[in-house]
């Protein structure tokens, strides 16, 4: 895909970004490089290659889904300045 200076200016205008001529030229060079890289990646033959979600083919060891800590809400709320119905009461900060 080829990109022109007018394309850069048009996108900047649509995004309501003020862009100088120098910045437009620099962005043109950078974006053209990105598009060239994308074209190179699209040209790679991937037929017969199995898609993968991770670079290392290994199984992650997971722990059992069991409760390991007890409920300490009563202990924590015993030192709170104010609580009501199990909730912490805090000063109002937004009017």
Swiss-Prot record:
It is an enzyme of class 6 (ligase). It catalyses: L-glutamyl-tRNA(Gln) + L-glutamine + ATP + H2O = L-glutaminyl-tRNA(Gln) + L-glutamate + ADP + phosphate + H(+); L-aspartyl-tRNA(Asn) + L-glutamine + ATP + H2O = L-asparaginyl-tRNA(Asn) + L-glutamate + ADP + phosphate + 2 H(+). It comes from the Bacteria. Its EC number is 6.3.5.-. Keywords: ATP-binding, Ligase, Nucleotide-binding, Protein biosynthesis. GO terms for molecular function: asparaginyl-tRNA synthase (glutamine-hydrolyzing) activity; ATP binding; glutaminyl-tRNA synthase (glutamine-hydrolyzing) activity. One of its GO terms (biological process) is regulation of translational fidelity. Coiled coil: none annotated. InterPro entries: Asp/Glu-ADT_sf_sub_c, GatC. It holds the Pfam family GatC. Allows the formation of correctly charged Asn-tRNA(Asn) or Gln-tRNA(Gln) through the transamidation of misacylated Asp-tRNA(Asn) or Glu-tRNA(Gln) in organisms which lack either or both of asparaginyl-tRNA or glutaminyl-tRNA synthetases. The reaction takes place in the presence of glutamine and ATP through an activated phospho-Asp-tRNA(Asn) or phospho-Glu-tRNA(Gln). Belongs to the GatC family. Heterotrimer of A, B and C subunits. This is Aspartyl/glutamyl-tRNA(Asn/Gln) amidotransferase subunit C. The lineage of its organism: Bacteria, Pseudomonadati, Pseudomonadota, Betaproteobacteria, Nitrosomonadales.
